[in-house]
């Protein structure tokens, strides 16, 4: 599915023609009625795939990554394995190792708050976190450009209350011990510079519902350049 923003300066017809005449796989082209921006497009795409089209699993890969030959296979295998645990909400096979990786690390996973360059999520998890994400979308992304969203209100009125509420604890079977303290995505206190985009809200929604995101210690993809194309990997 290809999503093309609309708006006064858009050229949807030309972009659609490029897509349809290229060799890029294309199921359908969705023409937005206005300029959605990255946040609403990513939320809307997950809404379409899960809520509208009934997909059971979605893998997201940003253009900052170059997937390795076993990227998809390993992602799907890890997701299948993780379904046995009620506390795993997302899996990913990309990571930023903080030490040298050896062959014995190939099967090691760890909980992470690393950047959302890539992840895999199942519909059962999406159904639990989407209410938070949709509330964020309707309150702060409608009728305003993504760059001009009210980040102060998002942090103070939307994110902070979720930090002070008791985090849901999942029932067994659990991957992590019941006494494991999985920190909130942005530390114990929300700083003024905390991210407020849809990735941040997705991470917060996972955390408040008691989920963790796990990543293979050994990355199955490499970043373009040193720090990717358009964002910083470390939050």
Where are these regions (language model features)?
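Short glycine- and hydrophobic/aromatic-rich loop-to-beta-strand nucleating segment
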Residues: 117-124
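Short beta-strand-to-loop acidic/aromatic patch adjacent to the donor-nucleotide binding site
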Residues: 54-66
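Short beta-strand segments
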Residues: 1-3, 92-94, 215-217
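Conserved donor NDP-sugar-binding/catalytic core segment of glycosyltransferases
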Residues: 65, 70-106
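Active-site nucleotide-sugar/metal-binding loop of Leloir-type enzymes
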Residues: 43-57
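C-terminal catalytic/acceptor-binding lobe
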Residues: 142-235
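A short, glycine-/small-residue-rich helix N-cap motif at loop->alpha-helix starts
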Residues: 33-41
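Acidic donor-binding segment of Leloir-type glycosyltransferases
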Residues: 1-30
């Amino acid at each position: 599915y290809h999503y093309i923003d609309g708006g006064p300066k858009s050229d949807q017809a030309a972009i659609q023609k490029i897509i349809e005449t290229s060799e890029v796989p294309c199921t359908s082209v969705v023409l937005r009625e206005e300029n959605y921006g990255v946040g609403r497009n990513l939320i809307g795409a997950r809404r379409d795939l899960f809520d509208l089209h009934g997909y059971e699993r979605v893998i997201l890969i940003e253009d900052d990554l170059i997937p390795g030959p076993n990227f998809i296979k390993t992602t799907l295998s890890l997701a299948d394995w993780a379904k046995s645990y009620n506390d795993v909400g997302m899996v990913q096979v990309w990571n930023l190792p903080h030490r040298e990786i050896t062959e014995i690390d190939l099967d090691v996973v760890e909980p992470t708050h690393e950047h959302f360059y890539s992840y895999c999520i199942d519909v059962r998890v999406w159904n639990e976190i989407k209410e938070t994400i949709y509330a964020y979308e309707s309150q702060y992304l409608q009728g305003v450009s993504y760059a001009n969203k009210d980040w102060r209100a998002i942090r103070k009125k939307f994110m902070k209350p979720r930090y002070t509420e008791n985090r849901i604890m999942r029932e067994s079977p659990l991957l992590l011990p019941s006494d494991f303290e999985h920190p909130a995505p942005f530390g114990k206190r929300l700083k003024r510079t905390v991210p407020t985009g849809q990735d941040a809200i997705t991470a917060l929604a996972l955390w408040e519902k008691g989920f963790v995101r796990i990543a293979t210690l050994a990355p199955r993809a490499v970043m373009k350049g040193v720090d990717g194309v358009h964002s910083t990997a470390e939050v």
